[in-house]
A protein has these predicted regions:
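A cross-family phosphate/adenosyl-ligand binding-site feature
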Residues: 1-86, 93-144
């Protein structure tokens, strides 16, 4: 079983209705949702699941997480989690290789978080290199 937390940027690529339809799940996205927060929902989402997977993990969310920022529901749940986070990076090869991103990756690994990927391959920008999002089946295999 799983829960979905979508960031504001998620909805630039996929609509909330489509995400709920294909997942057949409620999609959480608002940090200050009154109904959810009556029961401290961000803590429940962070702790009531066996695994937490960030898919895809942009340079932005990796950097914010490494610095402990909690400016949306996803990051707040990641910080509140009592387990390692599984992070699947997806970005341009130059972004992935940037020393600032690599320092944040190192810091998160030192704190016990796991990185799944990125793969080498064709990137969304048309280039080839490291930074490609791993296939969903790879995430499932890593979590077994």
């Amino acid at each position: 079983d799983f829960e979905i937390i979508a960031t504001k940027n998620t909805y630039e690529f996929i609509s909330p209705l489509l995400l709920e339809t294909i997942s057949r799940k409620k999609v959480y996205s608002q940090l200050f949702d009154l109904d959810m927060e009556k029961n401290i929902g961000h803590i429940r989402l962070a702790r009531d699941n066996t695994h937490i997977v960030v898919y895809p993990a942009t340079a932005n969310i990796i950097s914010k997480f490494a610095q402990g920022l909690c400016d949306d529901l996803a990051l707040t749940c990641m910080i509140a989690a009592n387990k390692p986070i599984n992070i699947a990076p997806a970005m341009n090869k130059e972004m992935w290789d940037n020393s600032l991103i690599q320092n944040n990756v190192k810091l998160l690994r030192e704190h016990g978080h796991n990185f799944i990927g990125p793969d080498d391959g064709s990137l969304a920008c048309g280039e080839y290199g490291s930074g490609r999002l791993v296939d969903p089946i790879e995430i499932i295999n890593q979590l077994k």
